[in-house]
Amino acid sequence: MILKFKVSILFIIPFYFGLIDAQIIHNQKCGIPPEESNHSRNWGYGYNDLLDDIEIWQQSQYVNIDSIGRTVQGRAIWELTISEDPSSITHKRIYIHARTHPGEEEAFWVTDEIINFLLADAPEASFIRSNTIFHIVPMHNPDGVELGYSRENANGLDIESGWDDNVLEPEVSVLQNRFLELSFAIPNPIQVALNMHSAYACKRYFVYHHENGTSSYFTDLEKDFISGIQHYYPNGIEDWNYFVSWSSNTPDQYPESWWWFNYAENVMALTYEDMNCSDAGNYNVTAEAIVRGVCDYLGINLAGINDQKEIPSAYALKQNYPNPFNPSTTIDVQLKQSGGNIRLSIVDISGNEIKVLANNYIPAGVKSFQWD
């Protein structure tokens, strides 16, 4: 087991966590093969894990968490609203949803890091919260996650491509109604809508929509938006033209189709694809690039914000206790002379982050964190 500080120091402590197998890449398209279902581990992050994280997230004064509807099997679809003033009529509004395809769990980890970045006790995060309202659905299809499906909901349907059905699946209807609620007849409607996925190609990229399916003006906006995010992760995110879609016409079955038919250039609605392979990682870097790029696109200037990282002058990570443990263990972190920003996370032996215990400023002294 590896415990990791954001101050670029790795601590290894002697307790064991099972290996998480890498997925096999068969071809270059969104998701993983349908036959590769995984009933035993819910793709590494299940609905109960989400409920545990909700307990942590809702401790922040800047988060409102509520169910926006229910799935086929009756599970709540949870939405986080992150802002210092969620009732503002001037703040820029952004919507992000992830895990429509259960097997594309990398999309969740990027989304998770977006949440961590927005909730951090840092000047930039505070400035963003004071100018924006982020709505985030970390798990759009929890039934599919719990059933071990790669792309489908409990009815066995791919809800990503069901936005034009005569009778909408519950998960599609819930999200569509929420989009309408936050876009129709309010002074600050959604301006950016990101649909988080991951793909076989083992690349990070946005799905660019050709002008034949949108407009020449929108493609100019797309290029600026994608290139603006890539600017913050130049060697990690592909160029805007890496994956071009809608080159012959406008399809009508996707979330982005719905956005285009209803709001056209007024909403930057795009799919983001992370790496769906064993090389996936750097989710925090990707998340920060996305948030910064979104802010730039919306005219929120972070350049003048003082975001000097406060690094503790002396620190120590204590041995966890009890060890071995079942079902929980306690980990003490000591900052000896001054406080500072820390990120304490649990990482498996393959380097995959499985739990964030802390991502904020803590004062000098001993702070205990529990993991179960």
Walk through the language-model features, giving the residues of each.
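Soluble metallo-hydrolase cores and metallopeptidase-like ectodomains found primarily
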Residues: 41-94
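Short proline/glycine- and polar residue-rich coil/turn motifs
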Residues: 70-72, 360-367
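Short, acidic, Ser/Thr-enriched surface-loop or helix-capping motifs
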Residues: 71, 348-349
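Active-site/substrate-binding loop(s) of hydrolase catalytic cores
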Residues: 72-76, 88-248, 252, 256-276
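His/Asp/Glu-rich mid-to-C-terminal helical/loop segments that flank catalytic regions of hydrolases
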Residues: 278-302
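Glycine-centered coil/turn sites that cap beta-strands in beta-rich domains
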Residues: 306-321, 325-346, 356-359, 368-371
